[in-house]
Amino acid sequence: MAKKVTGQIKLQVTAGKANPSPPIGPALGQHGVNIMDFCKAFNARTADQEGMIIPVVITVYADKSFSFITKTPPAAILLKKAAKIAKGSAVPNKDKIGKVSMQDVEEIARLKMPDLNATDLDAACRIIQGTARSMGIEIVQ
């Protein structure tokens, strides 16, 4: 018989740098999960993506065990890295703060494809372009 699920926790954690301090500690502690076990497993799984912010979905079971799924980094993080900017524009319709090429958008869309609600690469590219537009990043051909 399958284990009974008692909770699901969604966090965004820097790859390879999970530690028991907030926000991870309190989120896992209230579900009774062994925090250090999660931190060690997460850091081992994300060691190759050092420094990126990785969304993680942790499923907690009745016996206090857990499993977790790591997702791809958020599109906004990948776009900021491609445009070499620190943060998005405060007024994206007026101030364009960076530029990315269509090739960069396609590369990000390919990377994000498993997590996007898109059936083909063209639809995924349009989703990434929308994110770029809302951040004040201009797309050049």
UniProtKB/Swiss-Prot annotation:
Signal sequence span is none
Record-linked SUPFAM superfamilies: Ribosomal L11/L12e N-terminal domain, Ribosomal protein L11, C-terminal domain
Choose one Gene Ontology CC annotation of this protein and give it.
Answer: cytosolic large ribosomal subunit
The keyword ATP-binding is assigned to this record: no
Q: Where are the transmembrane segments?
A: none
Which InterPro entries has this protein been placed in?
Ribosomal_uL11, Ribosomal_uL11_bac-typ, Ribosomal_uL11_C, Ribosomal_uL11_C_sf, Ribosomal_uL11_N, Ribosomal_uL11_N_sf
PTM remark? One or more lysine residues are methylated.
Q: Per its record, what are the GO molecular function terms?
A: large ribosomal subunit rRNA binding; structural constituent of ribosome
Among the GO biological process terms of this entry, one is:
translation
The UniProt subunit note reads as follows: Part of the ribosomal stalk of the 50S ribosomal subunit. Interacts with L10 and the large rRNA to form the base of the stalk. L10 forms an elongated spine to which L12 dimers bind in a sequential fashion forming a multimeric L10(L12)X complex.
Write down the PANTHER family for this protein, in alphabetical order.
Answer: 60S RIBOSOMAL PROTEIN L12, LARGE RIBOSOMAL SUBUNIT PROTEIN UL11M
Q: Which NCBIfam families match?
A: L11_bact (TIGR01632)
Q: Its function?
A: Forms part of the ribosomal stalk which helps the ribosome interact with GTP-bound translation factors.
This protein is called: Large ribosomal subunit protein uL11
UniProt gene name: rplK
